[in-house]
């Protein structure tokens, strides 16, 4: 899937490159899609990458923190855009996100048992406000921020087993706030919008082990999502 996503982005990028120089950076660019942003509602889709991690807080000083190794995941989803004012839009961007984090727990004596692979498939539902600057030629930068709700399809929330049998458990539903920036690039037939966004979990997502003195979860006060999303949106 990652290779397919890279291929799609590469082909799209090569196809756009010929237009990009003449239509965006020339001295007198042809203004594309001049009235596109005046639509009350418009739709799109996105492809992208993510890097998810966790922020741990501890009950007592652990000496050595839980080590979080982040990997690159992928995103795909839809975009619905509602124009509120000239420079303000409301956006809904439901998407499917896949990611993996490798956690190493220093309090576990057995080196092999320290590692937990946390693979997650998320249904992600952000509701965002988009603040756009004045359009210059075929470019229009913007800021975006808001709240999101995430459904973790691989949370193991209802599992009876815990880390002592290799099962890492998380809460199924989480809430986040998000903040980022991007730029709208107007081509002849479509608008392309690369963006980068940070995701910050609001509540503890960890389900503790059955043993309150577990070396995995006993000293953890909270575990919250931290993520970076890079999306390439086509309208």
Residue ranges and their predicted role:
Residues 174, 182-235:
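Predominantly the C-terminal beta-signal and adjacent terminal strand-loop region
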Residues 28-29, 77-78, 126-131, 179-181:
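Short, well-ordered amphipathic alpha-helices
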Residues 37-41, 49-55, 81-156, 231-235:
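Gram-negative (and chloroplast) outer-membrane scaffold detector with strong preference
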Residues 39-41, 70-74, 119-125, 139, ...:
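Residues that define the transmembrane beta-barrel architecture of outer-membrane proteins
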Residues 19-72, 235:
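Short glycine/proline- and aromatic-enriched beta-strand/turn motifs that initiate or cap beta-hairpins
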Residues 73-83:
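A short, N-terminal amphipathic alpha-helix
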Residues 1-26, 232-235:
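Bacterial Sec-dependent N-terminal signal peptides
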Residues 54-68, 99-120, 151-171, 206-221:
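Flexible, solvent-exposed loop segments that connect beta-strands
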């Amino acid at each position: 899937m990652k290779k397919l996503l890279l291929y799609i982005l590469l082909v799209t990028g090569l196809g756009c490159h010929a237009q990009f120089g003449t239509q965006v950076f020339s001295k007198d660019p042809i203004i594309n899609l001049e009235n596109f942003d005046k639509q009350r509602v418009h739709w799109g889709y996105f492809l992208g990458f993510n890097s998810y991690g966790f922020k741990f807080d501890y009950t007592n000083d652990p000496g050595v923190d839980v080590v979080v190794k982040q990997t690159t995941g992928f995103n795909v989803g839809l975009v619905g855009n509602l124009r509120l004012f000239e420079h303000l839009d409301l956006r809904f961007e439901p998407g499917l996100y896949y990611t993996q984090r490798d956690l190493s727990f220093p309090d576990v004596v057995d080196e092999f048992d320290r590692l937990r692979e946390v693979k997650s498939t998320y249904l992600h539902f952000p509701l965002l406000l988009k603040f756009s600057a004045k359009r210059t030629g075929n470019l229009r930068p913007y800021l975006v921020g808001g709240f999101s709700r995430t459904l973790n399809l691989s949370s193991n929330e209802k599992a009876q087993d815990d880390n002592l049998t290799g099962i890492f458990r998380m809460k199924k539903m989480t809430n986040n706030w998000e903040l980022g920036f991007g730029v709208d690039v107007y081509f002849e037939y479509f608008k392309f919008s690369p963006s980068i966004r940070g995701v910050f979990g609001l509540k503890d997502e960890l389900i503790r082990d059955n043993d309150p003195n577990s070396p995995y979860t006993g000293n953890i006060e909270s575990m919250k999502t931290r993520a970076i999303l890079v999306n390439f949106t086509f309208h």
